[in-house]
Amino acid sequence: MIAVISPGFVLFAALLAGLWYACPPPRRWQLLLGANLLFYAVLCPAALPVLAGSSFLVWWCGRRTAKKPVFLAGLAAALLPLALLKYLPAALGWQGTLANALGIGYFTLQLVSYLCDVRRGRILPEEKYARLLCYASFFLSITQGPFNRYDALMPQLDRPTVWDTDRAWRGVQRSAWGYFKKLAVADRAAVVVDTVFANPAAFDRTQLLLGGVLFTVQLYADFSGYTDIVLGVGEVLGLHLPENFRQPFFADSVKDIWARWHISLSQWLRDYIYIPLGGSRCSKARKDGNLIITFLVSGLWHGAGLTYLVWGGLHGLCQAAENHLPPRRPGKLRHALRVAGTFCILAGAFVIFRASSLANAAELFKGILCNGGHAVFSNYWELGLTSLQEEILLYAGIAILLAVDAAHERGVSLRTKIAALPTPARWAIYEVCIFVFLFMGRFLGGGSFLYARY
């Protein structure tokens, strides 16, 4: 098994890195294509023909986009697998091997962006089908992103990048930080979140509040952890992939959230939905409508359920409302209040996102308002935790995560600072980090990455 969270992936990435630097640069894209197809074939073999077929149709249409009917046919070819394998099974209640195939939302949007960029003249159509397939199937981003633009990723594969020990070590550090987020924060938070959302009526308001907040933390640690892992592997290979997160819990508006959270999706929505609708160069009413439509599309991309559509609509409505607020007044206290308020909106919307249905979300919100008590401070076992130590480790992991984000928000690069220390001090820090990771990580019973389902 070579899922990103498995030891098999570490071995797979290490072997690929060795072959990568042994391979002549003009042939590296072919090596990567083989690695991509092997990776996807192991994880989701039934969907491999769908990926290959959709990529072929988009490649064929991309060479003929001067004709609008061909361009539209290419868009249909890119979007059809998403409609047939994600939305149709959800609408009809089908459960099968191909239902919601792994990574289908990611390679679909990448193929759409390629086709649109060719149509607009931003890039030249790819002559080789295999190279487009390499782009669409890129193993580091096919399951959870980040979204890559064709003109940003593919030229890197032809550059004569040589081995750089310092760069590779930075990549390993970043991947290790991603595994810490996943195993020490996300998977520990998942225990509480799954317990609370399964039966909201059984918990008091403090436990429900904790469950709602912890899901936001879980999703951030899980998703950004994955991003750190794959960006670290990319760094080892000498590939620069787009950043996907920038301290989202420090956002001071809903608009600012989307400049910090799932950044590559936000940019995709801006370039291929919002701007074609008219963007902000129109009347205020139409601008508001464009925002709402864009985020409804975002919700629909995440899933076919009403919970996703409502979640997306809420983000669109909040951004539209922010456009009509008076200018901000400066001040640290006002900024802190805006950050706190924005986090409440983010966490509240994510309750709907996580809920199994709108009724499940309503039950949880009702419990927050009506269920008295404060057992969150004592009865940890009710939340699925097996010991007080497990609860302490959860909060300690969150504290470390927030402390690192706070440093980054102030412009402090911890990796740079550590690298500048004398060798004994630097390695002492590395050893402490390894011990903390081994002590705090939840290595048994952890789940897959949350965003792999989208």
Predicted regions span which residues?
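Membrane-embedded transmembrane alpha-helical bundles that form the catalytic cores
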Residues: M1-R453
